[in-house]
Amino acid sequence: MLLSFTLAGLRALAAEPPASWVDPDTGHRVIRLTREPGSDSFYFNYNGFTPDGKKMAYTTTNGISVLNLETLEAKPIVTGRARPIVVGRKTSNLYYTRPTDNPFFSTLWRVNLDTGETRKLADLPCRAGVSTINADETLGAGTFIEGDANAGGAYDGTVPLGKMTDVNLGEPENKGEMMAQRLAAALPMTMFTINLQTGKIKTLLQHNTNWLNHLQFSPADPTLLMYCHEGSWQMVDRIWTIRTDGSHNQLIHKRSMENEIAGHEWWGADGETVFYQLHFPRGGHVSFIASYNVKTGQRVWLQYNPDQSSIHDNSSPDGKLYCGDGDNRSPWIFLFRPVILPNQRTLGRNLIKGGYLESEKLVNMTKQNYRLEPNPSFTPDMKYIVFRSNMFGPDYAFAVEVAKANPTP
């Protein structure tokens, strides 16, 4: 009996992924950040880092944990079913929601990642979710479907429960069908802000039959909110911004070609640049990381090739580099360096600035099941790119060093 337990333990130990390695195809060092099978870094545009850059929150099968990025020591910070929102830009508070016994209701909480102090902030309205916190941590923002309207079970307002298995199945195989079903239902929605001190809710949009989703506050301007008209990208003008007083509801990119798609948008660290992927047309060979500065109106389009494509891209804190998580056609974690083409005395005003991306492969992801999207993000010191992966079976969070460990792999 003792021998069988010992052999089982040895097999489990042997199956554990390496703590670090140098990718033989790229020469870059990869570090496994998390030890728990089923642990994931955050979605690519959710901030998971404390303002001092020393800690990172991540999800586990039993809640949310916090990782010391200097020592790689981790500890649970939220136990049980919970859905993270973001780590604050001003404090070390992590904001999250918890489900209740009723599948259409949830509660809003915060926990300090340094002290562990926890506070319930509010009971949310029926079918409501909060998905972003503003720069000075005074407001949250979210949406809910009004009344009892539904789309036959397709994205129609039940509360996310949090992941409870070692292997994240990722996106559903029939995601496209479900999204088309939900978009066609045209369910009336409300977009709101919630005061994090008082719990008071303020309506921004009401009775809106667009599918309102992916809310993101500017990381610098506490009154500026980005959101999207969700749905298959070729069917919607997706990316919008609005002020917290309900004014300046502005479309950021309008489609001009059949099957043109724009999406997977995110804020630059400056809090005034909106980045997004742009494809002319869907399934074609012309793609860009595009950006729009909400203060100056400047647009920049950086072209990339199909063999540089990613599900998600992201930008470095200083705005000088980009990264991508690859896809089934190009299974790599990428580093991108932008090249802006000089203006050859172009005549005209308000023209788009053009350029292209030079890519460097950082991690071979051929063993990745891309139903789990890696969701890359730069660490605050810009020395690493964090991503999630199931290349060893269960999910773990990893980091790849931007600088090469081996210059001649």
For the regions a protein language model found, what residue spans apply to each?
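Short, conserved, GDST-rich strand-edge loop motifs in beta-rich repeat architectures
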Residues: 99-100, 142-186, 228-236, 277-284, ...
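Hydrophobic beta-strand positions that form the internal "hydrophobic ladder"
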Residues: 56, 94-95, 139-140, 224-225, ...
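Blade/loop signatures of beta-propeller domains
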Residues: 13-31, 180-190, 350-351
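Surface loop/turn motifs at the tips and blade-to-blade linkers of beta-strand repeat domains
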Residues: 34-39, 77-80, 121-126, 204-210, ...
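Beta-strand-rich domains and repeat architectures in extracellular enzymes and scaffolds
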Residues: 18, 29-62, 215
